[in-house]
């Protein structure tokens, strides 16, 4: 199980996204509806994140690395990543999660660096965005 939260850059994340054992968790609140998102990401808004921890655990079953982000990854992304790590530490169930990471500079940094974004309205995003 993951022992701590680490950070990953957008450049490092791009090749990681090809691995089916990676999940991206977007914890932005309403701005995700209006902005784009990383294709295939799971959306668990920070304002209700604590209540949805078991749901996230189920949705990411079999994943080894979870990468959390908000707009800037300064507050919501890191705090939700830590909350999920604490949840896994206290949960009675087995977890495949070995790494919990936060995307440096968040979604805004991802988009500003020219990384691909998805503008679909699917929930959850199926990851086949153009």
Curated annotation (Swiss-Prot):
| Residues at the active site | 70 (cysteine persulfide intermediate)
Q: Which PROSITE patterns match?
A: RHODANESE_3 (PS50206)
User: What upregulates or represses it?
Assistant: By arsenate.
- Per UniProt, residues of the Rhodanese domain are 18-119
Q: What stretch or stretches form a coiled coil here? A: none
Q: Which InterPro entries match?
A: Rhodanese-like_dom, Rhodanese-like_dom_sf
Q: Does the keyword Oxidoreductase apply?
A: yes
Q: Does the keyword Oxidoreductase apply?
A: yes
Which leading EC class covers this enzyme? oxidoreductase
This entry's Enzyme Commission designation comes to 1.20.4.1
Q: What does this protein do?
A: Possesses arsenate reductase activity in vitro. Catalyzes the reduction of arsenate [As(V)] to arsenite [As(III)]. May play a role in arsenic retention in roots.
Record-given protein name? Arsenate reductase 2.2
């Amino acid at each position: 199980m993951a022992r701590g939260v680490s950070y990953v850059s957008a450049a490092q994340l791009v090749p990681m996204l090809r691995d089916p054992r990676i999940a991206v968790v977007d914890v932005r609140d309403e701005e995700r509806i209006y902005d784009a998102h990383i294709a295939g990401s799971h959306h668990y808004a920070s304002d209700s994140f604590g209540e949805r921890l078991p749901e996230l655990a189920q949705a990411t079953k079999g994943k080894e690395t979870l990468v959390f982000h908000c707009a800037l990854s300064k507050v919501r992304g890191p705090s939700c990543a830590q909350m999920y790590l604490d949840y896994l530490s206290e949960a009675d169930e087995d977890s495949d999660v070995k790494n919990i990471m936060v995307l440096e500079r968040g979604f805004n940094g991802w988009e500003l660096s020219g990384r691909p974004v998805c503008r679909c309205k699917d929930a959850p995003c199926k990851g086949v965005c153009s």
